[in-house]
Amino acid sequence: MKVSKNLKNYKMKKEVTKVDKPWGWEKWIEVNENYVVKELYMTAGNSCSLQYHEHKHESFYVLSGELKFLVGPDKDNLTEMVLYPGDYHTIEPFVVHKMEAIVDSLYLESSTNFLDDVIRLEDKYGRV
């Protein structure tokens, strides 16, 4: 068995970065040049922005709760669905989307590393 030379300097990551948001919080579990993994907690009745990304690809996986998910080619043509634990969805660049927590919800997001690639179309917290 061949062991990578990179493992000689391997260190277990012990801390995650927690980022408070108006709708709850994010925990940045892994951030590297290729991808980002986050755990997101959204409190009931709150939502992220109606938004899209120019470069970022992202996938969501619901761990607990219920999320209203809006998705479509533009803000006037959105499909609404409810996501439950075990449901997932992948969003390509330029796809308009929004999550809203029906009840307190926890989900994972895995994405390409374009953390600042957010174009907000609507936001109830004044971040447009």
Segments and roles (model prediction):
Residues P73-F94:
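Short acidic-glycine-tyrosine-enriched beta hairpin
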Residues E15-Q51, K56:
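A short glycine-rich, His/Asp/Glu-containing loop-to-beta-strand
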Residues H55-P73:
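Glycine- and acidic-residue-biased ligand/ion/polar-headgroup-sensing regions
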Residues Y10, K14, V19-D20, N77, ...:
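Double-stranded beta-helix
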